[in-house]
Structure formats: C-alpha cells, structure tokens
UniProtKB/Swiss-Prot annotation:
Family annotation (InterPro entries): PSII_PsbN (IPR003398)
Main subcellular location of this protein, as a coarse class: membrane
Keywords of the record: Membrane, Thylakoid, Transmembrane, Transmembrane helix
Lineage per the UniProt record: Bacteria, Bacillati, Cyanobacteriota, Cyanophyceae, Synechococcales
GO cellular component, one term: plasma membrane-derived thylakoid membrane
Pfam families: PsbN (PF02468)
Known role: May play a role in photosystem I and II biogenesis.
HAMAP family found in the cross-reference section: PSII_PsbN
Protein localization: Cellular thylakoid membrane
Family: Belongs to the PsbN family.
Name of protein: Protein PsbN
Source species: Parasynechococcus marenigrum (strain WH8102)
PANTHER family linked: PROTEIN PSBN
Annotated signal peptide: none
C-alpha cells in the first residue's frame, strides 16, 4: 500500500476543519442556541 503525500493529509485536515466550522455556524444560526440571538432591527423600530 502506498503512503499518502503530506499535502493530501494537510488538505483533508483543512477541509475537515472548515466543514466543522461551517456546521457549527449553521447550528448556532438555526439550532436551539439561535433563541438567544437578538435582532437589532426589532430593537430599534422607527
């Protein structure tokens, strides 16, 4: 079995981190923690 190149390992690691951060952001925006978010447009009605 051939060993994979270090560049491929780094690329997969970076991809995993980016996907994790994206998933966490979507969870924060639309999941249960989103109930604690305030809408600044609702706070300052004209």
């Amino acid at each position: 079995m051939e060993t994979s190149s270090p560049a491929l390992s780094v690329a997969i690691g970076v991809l995993a981190v980016l996907l994790g951060m994206t998933g966490f952001g979507v969870y924060q925006a639309f999941g249960p923690p989103s109930k604690a978010l305030d809408d600044p447009f609702d706070d300052h009605e004209d």
